[in-house]
Amino acid sequence: MFRIVLASASPRRRELLQSLGLEFEVLPAGVNEDFAGRDPADMAESLAERKARAVAGRVGDGLILGADIVVFQRGRFLGKPEGPEEAAAMLTALQGDTHEVLTGVSLIRMPDGHAVVDHERTRVHFRAMTAQEIDWYVATGEPLDKAGAYAIQGLGGLFVRGIKGCWFNVVGLPLPLLSGLFRRQGVDLLNLVGTNWSSSGRR
């Protein structure tokens, strides 16, 4: 069985891979994410590769997947809010405006350590939100562990007027880009998905 290791503790990335029927292991990587002032695409790719490399030494053979998401609006990075007040401030800035979500993805092949890395960029437009709506959403707790203080696949989707680009990217892992990175590493992800999908009885 081909070994795939996800170097991330993100439940969203785990759920997306599981939705494909892939078999994989999770080995979270502890990486400092303070890269303020850098180009957002470079930041996303660098963090993704650092996560994958932090785990690579523990994997003898297989592919290690690292990913990191960056929310960028008008020259400012919006990470995970430190509390309800910061979450409300982020949502106040996002409402009625457009921002960018970039996800860096790195795939390292072991044992030779060959790495490929790329990123996906999606533009997201929020509708106008009232102060009451922002307070309500923050009170649900959903924004508190999310970059940009929202989850498009959850209640946060109620406030998204539209996107330009990959929806999976905003969730946390751009699947079309991931498929391309697997091909660059000499692995056809479609074959892995097809085998596991059939054997698990999915229809």
From Swiss-Prot:
It is found in: Cytoplasm. The active site is at D68. It holds the Pfam family Maf. InterPro entries: ITPase-like_fam, Maf-like. NCBIfam families: maf (TIGR00172). Belongs to the Maf family. This is Nucleoside triphosphate pyrophosphatase. It comes from Desulforudis audaxviator (strain MP104C). The lineage of its organism: Bacteria, Bacillati, Bacillota, Clostridia, Thermoanaerobacterales.
